[in-house]
């Protein structure tokens, strides 16, 4: 299966540059797994497609201010870091730009000396291992020095940083938002619970595995970067109870899907625990846990569009994307949503 099989045409003006004023007023395209025609609604209408006894599984990760802009000691050259994952109390894996100006041993200072780092080594995927020096709690220093890591296709400054967090974000650690969850408002989530749908939290910290581009034409040669996940005993039990009563398990987002499918056992049981996942889901994959998916519209040739194609079929997803372009849906992180069910 080739990378070009997952390409599509998208005019630049359809890339959403800011969130809508109301989270749940984005548009919703419904893609039915039974092959019925696509439906076009508002996101708040998602309740019309949920049944009492179903479960929505959400990713409660929280985005950290993972983007750091500093100066190289000695030359003053501008160096930018994107924190990917924490290794211990002072060491992180990070993407560094420009990489050619940041060989092993490079020292970088951020925030007028509040934070500094030294580059210790390179990683297999072109990143760096960096060691920070600071006083106090790293999280507090990062809040003062770091900024929200918006994707590069968003050119407009984000005035309200909380709009790049889900309303249920709890555990800090992501370098990007689980964007399908951005559409849920407190009122909508309450309404979903009141109608007898379980809302089950799991955790996957979004890192390079989610947004790293595919560089190989044969997609089977692509290797995912590991991302950390956790599933509690309570969440595992709640999913099993949903299955037992005949309900559907609907994942909110591709990151939730990766989490659940990484811990899946035959028969649809989800194993509780924590670990690192490198699962790569593309057409031909047999889903073990999820029956439906809430997701955004993804970049051409990305691992994320490959995942939704694995669930709904490549040709059907590309047809849905063509229709969305024709109807001028808003795309990517701050864009509109799709429900595959």
Swiss-Prot record:
InterPro entries in alphabetical order: QueA (IPR003699), QueA_dom1 (IPR042118), QueA_dom2 (IPR042119), QueA_sf (IPR036100)
Reactions the enzyme catalyzes: 7-aminomethyl-7-carbaguanosine(34) in tRNA + S-adenosyl-L-methionine = epoxyqueuosine(34) in tRNA + adenine + L-methionine + 2 H(+)
Cellular localisation: Cytoplasm
UniProt entry keywords in alphabetical sequence: Cytoplasm, Queuosine biosynthesis, S-adenosyl-L-methionine, Transferase
Cross-referenced HAMAP family: QueA
Recorded family membership: Belongs to the QueA family.
Name the UniProt record assigns to this protein: S-adenosylmethionine:tRNA ribosyltransferase-isomerase
Upper taxonomic lineage: Bacteria, Bacillati, Bacillota, Clostridia, Eubacteriales
Gene that specifies this protein: queA
């Amino acid at each position: 299966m080739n990378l070009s099989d997952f390409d599509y045409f998208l005019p630049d003006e359809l890339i959403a540059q800011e969130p809508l004023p109301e989270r749940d007023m984005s548009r919703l395209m419904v893609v039915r797994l039974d092959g019925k025609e696509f439906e076009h609604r508002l996101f708040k209408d998602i309740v019309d497609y949920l049944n009492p006894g179903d479960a929505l599984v959400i990713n409660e990760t929280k985005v950290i201010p993972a983007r750091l802009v500093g100066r190289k000691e000695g030359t003053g050259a501008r160096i930018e870091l994107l924190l990917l994952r924490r290794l211990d109390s002072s060491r992180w894996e990070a993407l560094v730009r420009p990489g050619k100006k940041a060989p092993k041993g490079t020292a970088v200072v951020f925030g007028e000396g509040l934070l500094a780092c030294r580059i210790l080594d390179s990683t297999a995927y072109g990143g760096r291992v960096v060691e920070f020096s600071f006083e106090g709690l790293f999280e507090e220093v990062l809040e003062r020095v770091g900024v929200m890591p918006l994707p590069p296709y968003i050119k407009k400054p984000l005035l309200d940083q909380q709009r790049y967090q889900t309303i249920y974000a709890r555990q800090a650690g992501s370098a990007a938002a689980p964007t399908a969850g951005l559409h849920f408002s407190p009122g909508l989530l309450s309404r979903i619970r009141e109608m007898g749908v379980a809302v089950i939290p799991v955790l996957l910290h979004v890192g390079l595995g989610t947004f790293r581009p595919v560089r190989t034409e044969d997609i089977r040669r692509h290797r995912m970067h590991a991302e950390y996940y956790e599933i509690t005993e309570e969440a595992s039990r709640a999913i099993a109870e949903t299955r037992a009563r005949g309900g559907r398990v609907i994942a909110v987002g591709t990151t939730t899907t990766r989490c659940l499918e990484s811990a899946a056992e035959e028969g649809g049981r989800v194993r509780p625990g924590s670990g690192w996942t490198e699962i790569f889901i593309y057409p031909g994959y047999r889903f073990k846990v999820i029956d439906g998916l809430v997701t955004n519209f993804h970049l051409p040739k990305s691992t994320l569009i490959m995942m939704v194609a694995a669930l709904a079929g490549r040709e059907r997803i590309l047809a849905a994307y063509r229709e969305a372009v024709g109807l001028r849906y808003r795309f990517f992180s701050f864009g509109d949503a799709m429900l595959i069910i």
